[in-house]
C-alpha cells in the first residue's frame, strides 16, 4: 500500500464508513441495500427520488420555470440520467448495479399515476425499467438529449442529478 501512497486506517467501531457483521444479514453501503442476492437502493435514496419527482410535478403545476415540453424533458432526465461530456450522470446511472426490478416498476407506476393526475401523456415519458438496461449499452440513444433546449446550465443539471442520490 505504501507504493500506492495509501494509508491503512484502523477499523473504527463508531465509523460510518465501515462496519462488520454476518454477510448473510442485510446491509447498506454507498446508498445500496444488499439482502441475500437482491441488490437494491437504500430506502432514503428511494424516498429522495419520489420527493424529487413530486417536486418536479409541483413546479410544473405551479407554472414555475418551464413549459410542458421542458417539463417532459426534465422528467425524462430525472428518470434516465444522461451523458454530459462523455460522463454518465443520474440516479439510474449511480444505481446501475441493482437487480431489484420491482423497485423500478414501482417508480414507473408512480410516474404514470402522476402523469395521469397532471394530464401529461405518459407515452412521452421514459421508463426506469428500461433505463437500467440502456445505461449499460454504449450504443444507446435513450440517454441522448438536446440540452441546449433547457433553460439551465450543464453545471446546474449535474447538481440536480446529485440531489437525487443519498449515498451517505
What residue ranges belong to the model's regions?
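Conserved catalytic core of two-metal-ion nucleotidyltransferases
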Residues: 2-37
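Right-hand nucleic-acid polymerase module
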Residues: 23-168
Amino acid at each position: 500500500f505504501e507504493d500506492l501512497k495509501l494509508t491503512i486506517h484502523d477499523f473504527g467501531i463508531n465509523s460510518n464508513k465501515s462496519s462488520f457483521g454476518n454477510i448473510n444479514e442485510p446491509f447498506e453501503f454507498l446508498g445500496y441495500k444488499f439482502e441475500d442476492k437482491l441488490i437494491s437502493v437504500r430506502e432514503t435514496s428511494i424516498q429522495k427520488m419520489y420527493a424529487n419527482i413530486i417536486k418536479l410535478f409541483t413546479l410544473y403545476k405551479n407554472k414555475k420555470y418551464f413549459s410542458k415540453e421542458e417539463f417532459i424533458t426534465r422528467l425524462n432526465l430525472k428518470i434516465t440520467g444522461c451523458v454530459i461530456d462523455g460522463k454518465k450522470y443520474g440516479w439510474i446511472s449511480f444505481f446501475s448495479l441493482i437487480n431489484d426490478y420491482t423497485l423500478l416498476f414501482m417508480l414507473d407506476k408512480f410516474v404514470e399515476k402522476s402523469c395521469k393526475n397532471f394530464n401529461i401523456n405518459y407515452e412521452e415519458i421514459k421508463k426506469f425499467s428500461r433505463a437500467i438496461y440502456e445505461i449499460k449499452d454504449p450504443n444507446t440513444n435513450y440517454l441522448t438529449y438536446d440540452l441546449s433546449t433547457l433553460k439551465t446550465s450543464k453545471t446546474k443539471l449535474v447538481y440536480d442529478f446529485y440531489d437525487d442520490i443519498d449515498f451517505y
